[in-house]
């Protein structure tokens, strides 16, 4: 004879794996060519000088130097560029 009633099922208990998005190299940090600067969905940050953009909108360094974040343009867009050291 069962001492516990049969447990009902729940419809919760699932979640997707985190995607580890965000800024990986901050302003003033030194980077080498190929280093990932920002992982993002869409273009929250835009590519400036010496920065490339991947098919998933990842921003990466094209040359070595220091990372620089700036806001410019009429729409106040955030740009990431690399300045030579």
Swiss-Prot record:
Coiled coil spans: none
PROSITE patterns, alphabetized: RIBOSOMAL_L27 (PS00831)
Alphabetized InterPro entries for the sequence: Ribosomal_bL27, Ribosomal_bL27_CS
Keyword Coiled coil annotated: no
Listed GO biological process terms: translation
Region (Disordered): 1-22
Organism superkingdom: Bacteria
Entries under Gene3D superfamilies matching the protein: 2.40.50.100
Keywords: Ribonucleoprotein, Ribosomal protein
GO cellular component terms attached to this protein's record: cytosolic large ribosomal subunit
Transmembrane segments: none
A Pfam family reported for this protein in Swiss-Prot or TrEMBL: Ribosomal_L27
Keyword Ribonucleoprotein: yes
GO MF entries: structural constituent of ribosome
SUPFAM superfamilies on file: Ribosomal L27 protein-like
Family: Belongs to the bacterial ribosomal protein bL27 family.
Protein name: Large ribosomal subunit protein bL27
